Design a protein with these regions (language model features):
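C-terminal active-site subregion of NodB/CE4 polysaccharide deacetylases
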Residues: 26-119, 126, 193-301
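Active-site flanking residues adjacent to catalytic metal/cofactor-binding acidic residues
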Residues: 120-121, 186
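Acidic (Asp/Glu)-rich catalytic clusters
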Residues: 53, 133-139, 166-186, 253, ...
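Aromatic- and acidic-residue-enriched segments that line the glycan-binding/catalytic groove
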Residues: 153-171, 203
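A short alpha/beta connector and helix-capping loop motif
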Residues: 130-148
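Non-cysteine beta-strand/loop elements that form the S-adenosyl-L-methionine
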Residues: 144-146, 184-188, 262
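Hydrophobic alpha-helical membrane-insertion segments, chiefly the h-region
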Residues: 17-27
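N-terminal Sec-pathway targeting helices
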Residues: 1-17
Length: 301
């Protein structure tokens, strides 16, 4: 009997130590899923992760459209997207949101050792139609960065529910933000264009004051519309076409933005207690014509 009790005590001690080691990671990976969504996938990701130390490399992947009908540089199929999510899960990545990265850079909160930032640019309706359920299925979260003028058109035209070409309405953006799956970013109101300037690039002959005011007017307009029409306050900015300038970073910081996303490929080291390290986050564009092997190689870098 005494031997059995000693064995039971040893087993109990080991169990307690394991819980102490892994419960924080489990909470981090699963806290933002639905209460009933503590799936095997989520648990596996949590147990394959640890909390980061004083710095961590962010892996960010940029998506645009998700469509069954075709693929291309900015379009992936639902099957491809689901396979990507499986790849992330099986390699121990834990999805994080920009607000969590910014908090870590401020010296608050934690990040997993293998943080993954999944982003969707432009605000296509098919992100809600196809990607939302898949993110839920795998216990992952993502950023959606809509273009204001496109959402305004969807609202005014009523043509808001065709996955092939519709963009998200303000109400749909608000619904996604409140789901616990998505966080919302700013992708400008109407600067996602090649003319009169390429994205947010400075126009020829434009003075510093004129350029800064143009940025404040457009980005500020989108910021306010998201707040009023979608009920969200954003602190993440995704650069159209990946174009940025020293003045744009200054303007965004003055407006309270805490993280900016580029189209430069690679991973980004973010340092605890260094807010500036959350700017110029690099991202891999997920080209729908590229194989899963391409993604696996990028993750391994």
């Amino acid at each position: 009997m005494a031997l059995k009790l000693r064995r039971l005590s040893i087993f109990t001690a080991i169990f307690v130590l394991l819980c102490a080691a892994f419960v924080p990671q489990l909470y981090f990976a699963c806290a933002h899923t639905r209460a009933s969504a503590l799936s095997e996938d989520c648990v596996a990701a949590a147990f394959n992760s640890q909390l980061a130390g004083e710095s961590v490399k962010i892996t960010a992947v940029m998506y645009h459209s998700v469509l069954k009908s075709k693929s291309g540089k900015y379009i992936v199929s639902p099957d491809t997207f689901e396979n990507d999510l499986r790849i992330y899960r099986d390699r121990g990545y834990v999805s994080v949101l920009p607000s969590e990265i910014a908090a870590y850079a401020r010296g608050e909160g934690d990040l997993p050792v293998k943080p993954l930032l999944i982003t969707f640019d432009d605000g296509h309706y098919n992100n809600l139609y196809y990607a939302h359920a898949l993110l839920e299925k795998y216990g992952m979260r993502a950023l959606i960065s809509p273009i204001g003028a496109f959402s305004e058109h969807s609202d005014s035209s009523g043509d808001d529910s065709n996955p092939n070409y519709s963009h998200l309405t303000w109400a749909q953006i608000g619904k996604m933000a409140s789901s616990g799956v998505w966080e919302v970013g700013n992708h400008t109101y109407n600067m996602h264009a090649y003319k009169p300037r390429f994205g947010i690039a400075r126009k020829a002959g434009e003075s510093d004051a004129q350029y800064m005011q143009a940025l404040r007017d457009d980005i500020g307009r989108m910021h306010e519309m998201l707040k009023v029409k979608s009920g969200v306050s954003v602190k993440t900015f995704a650069y159209p076409f990946g174009r940025y300038t020293p003045q744009s970073e200054k303007a965004l910081k003055e407006m309270g933005y805490e993280i900016t996303l580029t189209c430069n490929e690679g991973k980004t080291e973010v340092r605890r207690g260094s807010p500036d390290s959350a700017f110029y986050i690099k991202r891999y564009n997920r080209d729908g014509d590229r194989s899963a092997d391409w993604l696996i190689k990028k993750l391994a870098l």
